[in-house]
């Protein structure tokens, strides 16, 4: 049931084939490093001046739109799964940013069929500040939204090249790829996540880098990272983050 729930959260499913060597791991790292080398970007307005990978999917005069997404998903033992996070569309053409803070709860009926209930709170960004665009009466929730920080604002992957012995998967038919690494609770990124979120486990996470599309670069597909603290039938705790550069869609 864990996988059904994750489909409803990601709205995508990767089909991976394991068994690749060090060369493929190096290619995957190189692909992700194009984005991860930008971390941290404390001022999100800097994205207005950042160029991303362009291909034939982009119109000639389209400067592109950055889509950033961070969320924490927690399913304690015996309780419902809840995801809380935010997505922003940073339009380089109009130099405007809008998005949503999203709370998603997933329950199961007596047959084990997941039921998804989500609530979206529209936001905009001005002067590097997140501003709700509709009235929010819940003061605690409003503060949570206004103070929200994306992982790209504090994460750091300068040591990515030193990550060793990853579990590598690659499927050239999709194409899709992934690399998984065991992390330590003493690592910088893990400490930053524990500082910002109430993570109800002392277990050190695994870092999963996964994506779809041409490893050499493509605007079709996506790259996505996940810190998995706990993953089993009764309990799931993980954090996800993504930054993708896409053609603008009339925003």
Swiss-Prot record:
Signal sequence coordinates: 1-19
Keyword Membrane: yes
Residue numbers with lipid attached (N-palmitoyl cysteine): 20
GO annotation, cellular component aspect: plasma membrane
Subcellular location: Cell membrane
Topology term for the membrane: Lipid-anchor
Principal subcellular localization: membrane
Lipid-binding residues (covalent, S-diacylglycerol cysteine): 20
UniProtKB keywords: Cell membrane, Lipoprotein, Membrane, Palmitate, Signal
PROSITE patterns (alphabetical): PROKAR_LIPOPROTEIN (PS51257)
Cross-referenced InterPro entries: Csa, Csa_sf
Family designation: Belongs to the staphylococcal tandem lipoprotein family.
Protein name: Uncharacterized lipoprotein SE_0144
Lineage, opening ranks: Bacteria, Bacillati, Bacillota, Bacilli, Bacillales
